[in-house]
UniProtKB/Swiss-Prot annotation:
Pathway: Lipid metabolism; phospholipid metabolism. It is an enzyme of class 2 (transferase). It comes from Aromatoleum aromaticum (strain DSM 19018 / LMG 30748 / EbN1) (Azoarcus sp. (strain EbN1)). It is found in: Cytoplasm. The lineage of its organism: Bacteria, Pseudomonadati, Pseudomonadota, Betaproteobacteria, Rhodocyclales. Belongs to the PlsX family. The gene is plsX. This is Phosphate acyltransferase. It comes from the Bacteria. GO terms for cellular component: cytoplasm. Catalyzes the reversible formation of acyl-phosphate (acyl-PO(4)) from acyl-[acyl-carrier-protein] (acyl-ACP). This enzyme utilizes acyl-ACP as fatty acyl donor, but not acyl-CoA.
């Protein structure tokens, strides 16, 4: 994995306190990789001074004088903060100094800046946000998760292509299955956009499974689930809320009385395995697909372990030629300009 990843160290809730240790952990696990830490010089030097370097030229610093706040409007962040850590990290991908960028910062600003600097791939109208969700069978990739609230059938087709190429690249599956999220499996179900998208996906050459319902996401029915950003974001946030509720219920029940606490001790090994399987930190890192460069968005509240997963996803996508795979597929379908 001999790639260079640029990291926006100032983004997210914790800034360098998380991003710098995560970068070091990633480099320890990937001896051929390189990282460029982008941020305010004083903040980076302070973070590096506390934990040291030890990686020589594999870990370098790039100064950026500005920081994009989580509540900055995307348009203002793009126009007025051209020396922000986020913008400089994306610029490094544009120039070829890095093959991927990772940020835990403002999602809207990251999408706007990435699209402005890197541009979209030939044949792709709109970038989409794709992430991994755990399933009974392992995991599935879902897109779009909020970048595109309203979509045309052609956009959903493009999402299917990009999602399939992402899974092919990072999971090494030749023909990943693609499902279209709908209110029923039958072809007559859904609105006109979804019905037309299903027709396009059927003739796309992708391994199109057909319509899938919400429960199919966690059954692992398909490797990729396609939907518009409105539906995808609601599905994601609903899932997160359900997971938090179940975790709260478990804590309350196992701490209700002495007998419950004793049962909790007995069940601890199984509970730890359960926690590992559903640990959202393991799935951190949403890819911004459709750009002429690899960009991954980390959750803003990510800890060092979770942020390291986002770095790994970015490096893996870049080293496995994700951008080239999408371009080649679009060209083969005759839709790349």
């Amino acid at each position: 994995m001999g790639v260079t990843v640029a990291i926006d160290c100032m983004g997210g809730d914790h800034g360098p306190a998380v991003t710098v240790p995560a970068a070091r952990a990633f480099l320890r696990n990937h001896p051929e990789a390189r990282i460029v830490l982008v941020g305010r010089q004083d903040a980076l030097e302070q973070a590096m001074g506390a934990i040291g370097n030890g990686f020589g030229e594999r870990l370098s610093l790039r100064a950026a004088s500005e920081v994009i706040a989580m509540d900055d409007p995307p348009a203002i962040a793009m126009r007025s903060k051209k020396d922000s850590s986020m913008r400089v990290a994306i610029d490094l991908v544009k120039s070829g100094e890095a093959q991927a960028a990772v940020s835990a910062g403002n999602t809207g600003a990251l999408m706007a800046i990435s699209r402005f600097v890197l541009k979209t791939l030939p044949g792709i109208d709109r970038p989409a946000i794709a992430t991994i969700l755990p399933t009974r069978k392992g995991q599935t990739y879902v897109l779009d998760l909020g970048a595109n609230v309203d979509c045309l059938p052609e956009h959903l087709l493009q999402f299917g292509i990009m999602g399939a190429m992402l899974v092919s690249a990072v999971e090494h599956l030749d023909r990943p299955t693609v499902g279209l999220l709908n209110i029923g499996e039958e072809a007559i179900k859904g609105n006109e956009v979804v019905k037309r998208a299903a027709e396009l996906l059927k003739t796309s050459g992708l391994n199109f499974y057909g319509n899938v319902e919400g429960d199919d996401i966690y059954k692992g029915t398909t490797d990729v689930v396609v939907c518009d950003g409105f539906v995808g974001n609601v599905a994601l946030k609903t899932s997160e809320g359900l997971a938090q509720m179940l975790a709260t219920f478990l804590r309350e029940e196992f701490s209700r009385n002495l007998l419950s606490k004793a049962m909790a001790l007995i069940a601890m090994p199984a509970l730890k395995r359960f926690k590992h399987r559903v640990d959202h930190r393991r799935y951190n890192g949403a890819a911004l697909l459709g750009l002429r460069g690899v960009v991954v968005k980390s959750h803003g509240s990510a800890d060092a372990f979770a942020f390291e997963q986002a770095i790994h996803r970015a490096a893996e996508a870049a080293s496995n030629r994700l951008i080239e795979r999408i371009t080649e597929r679009m060209t083969a379908m005759g839709v790349a300009a």
